[in-house]
């Protein structure tokens, strides 16, 4: 019939940070093949699926992925060869069964995910469809409102800013292409402003600038200045989104948040909640991701009660794209959105399950890249297939980020008049003003 898996190949390639990662090819009987490469994160949740690394310090500083590749060749491939590539759920379940651990530590989530994504791409190609059409069927027509990273701090840079990502969202755009144009204009305007103030305009892992700003507040202030100077209205045309990655600032022993790159302040959960409440009043912020640490569920509840009806509160480290953690969050009334990172959970099937659970509970979902990326554009197709309406995939620089935006521009063109861009209305989990 031609749609059965004939062969699976795997290799070690290099990601955007110069670290090894896994790439897999799934080849069907008729010669059709799908290829996928796996990303990796800098700040990772403690409950994430395990990214299998070799640990041999003499090779790639211990970050080699040859064990994961051997697992694909020796364990996964023999079991999947002969199976139908058109049954994604069966493929993914077979790999989960072969691994048998909650965090995929036996085979490695990087091994499993590469095969999961490559299978879907092979199946799509076999049917003459794009991956977004194959995975999303007739519902795949919503282009995402992008979260574009323009200032980096924390673990993603080497500066005096505590918070990891300051992003802009073109909520007033009419199309995805227009959103990218608006974001690019602000990005270039910001570069000029930073340069004029004597700041460096080198970029971090995700393509945003990493200037040695004097404070966390200054990051918001220069972004607002750039939005205005580019000819847009902050909060109406373009809003700010944050990922402070506070799990990186949290000391579980003292239960304090340490602003270690700036003031050295130590804040209690209550003080951290008040900190964000003041920022939301002061700046045109529409979304905060990981505003509290992943271990601080009580703090998360307080934050949600305080500002969950004003802005989107996204759980990344908190939920790690995992339905069991998301279920707990929904039951507790914690956060109102989930970040979707395919490599946090490890298969496309589980990713779809997490998004479905979020939507049923009235939570939004944002498909996300990782700080260590490749030229693979699967998540661009995935965000359209899932219809989540939001994507987080870095800045308006670095090809590993731009590749995703360019793929979405192509998809928008292909969809023609059926393409939809929802802008601000994607925030259905918060009360609209």
UniProtKB/Swiss-Prot annotation:
SUPFAM superfamilies: Enolase C-terminal domain-like, Enolase N-terminal domain-like. Coiled coil: none annotated. It is found in: Cytoplasm; Secreted; Cell surface. (2R)-2-phosphoglycerate binds at residues 164, 341, 370-371, 392. Disulfide bonds: none annotated. GO terms for biological process: gluconeogenesis; glycolytic process; symbiont entry into host; symbiont-mediated evasion of host immune response. Transmembrane segments: none annotated. Its cofactor is Mg(2+). GO terms for cellular component: cell surface; cytosol; external side of cell outer membrane; extracellular region; membrane; phosphopyruvate hydratase complex. The keyword Secreted applies. The active site is at 206 (proton donor), 341 (proton acceptor). Mg(2+) binds at residues 243, 289, 316. It is an enzyme of class 4 (lyase). The keyword Magnesium applies. Pathway: Carbohydrate degradation; glycolysis; pyruvate from D-glyceraldehyde 3-phosphate: step 4/5. NCBIfam families: eno (TIGR01060). Belongs to the enolase family. This is Enolase. It comes from Borreliella burgdorferi (strain ATCC 35210 / DSM 4680 / CIP 102532 / B31). The gene is eno.
């Amino acid at each position: 019939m031609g749609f059965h898996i004939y062969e699976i190949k795997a290799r070690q390639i290099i990601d955007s940070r110069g670290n090894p990662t896994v790439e897999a090819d799934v080849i069907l009987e008729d010669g059709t093949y799908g290829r996928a490469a796996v990303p990796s994160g800098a700040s990772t949740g403690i409950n994430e699926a395990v990214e299998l690394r070799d640990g041999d310090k003499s090779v790639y500083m211990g970050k080699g992925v040859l064990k994961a590749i051997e697992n694909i060749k020796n364990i996964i491939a023999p079991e999947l060869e002969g199976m139908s590539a058109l049954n994604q759920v069966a493929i993914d379940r077979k790999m989960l069964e072969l691994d048998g651990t909650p965090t995929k530590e036996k085979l490695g989530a990087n091994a499993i995910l590469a095969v999961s994504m490559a299978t879907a791409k092979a199946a799509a190609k076999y049917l003459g469809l794009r991956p977004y059409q194959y995975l999303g069927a007739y519902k795949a027509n919503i282009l995402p409102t992008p979260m574009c990273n323009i200032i980096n701090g924390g673990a993603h840079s080497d500066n005096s800013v505590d918070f990891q990502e300051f992003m802009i969202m073109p909520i007033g755009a009419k199309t995805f292409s227009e959103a990218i144009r608006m974001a690019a204009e602000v990005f270039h305007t910001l570069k000029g402003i930073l340069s004029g103030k004597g700041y460096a305009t080198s970029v971090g892992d995700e393509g945003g600038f990493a200037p040695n700003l004097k404070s966390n507040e200054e990051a918001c202030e220069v972004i607002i200045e750039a939005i205005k100077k580019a000819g847009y209205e902050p909060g109406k045309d373009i809003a700010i989104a944050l990922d402070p990655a506070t799990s990186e600032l949290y000391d579980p022993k003292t239960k304090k948040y340490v602003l270690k790159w700036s003031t050295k302040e130590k804040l209690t959960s209550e003080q951290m909640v008040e900190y964000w409440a003041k920022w939301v009043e002061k700046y045109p912020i529409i979304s905060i991701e990981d505003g509290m640490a992943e271990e601080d569920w009580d703090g998360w509840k307080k934050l949600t009660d305080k500002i969950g009806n004003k802005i989107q509160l996204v759980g990344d480290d908190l939920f790690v794209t995992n339905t069991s953690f998301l279920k707990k969050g929904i039951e507790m009334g914690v956060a109102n959105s989930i970040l979707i990172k395919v490599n946090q959970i490890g298969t496309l099937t589980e990713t779809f399950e997490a998004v479905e659970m979020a939507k049923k509970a009235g939570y939004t979902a944002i498909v996300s890249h990782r700080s260590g990326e490749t030229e693979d554009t699967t998540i661009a197709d995935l965000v359209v297939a899932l219809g989540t309406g939001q994507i987080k995939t870095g800045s308006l620089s670095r090809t590993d980020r731009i590749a995703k935006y360019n793929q979405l521009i192509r998809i928008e063109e292909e969809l023609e008049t059926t393409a939809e861009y929802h802008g601000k209305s994607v925030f259905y989990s918060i009360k609209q003003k």
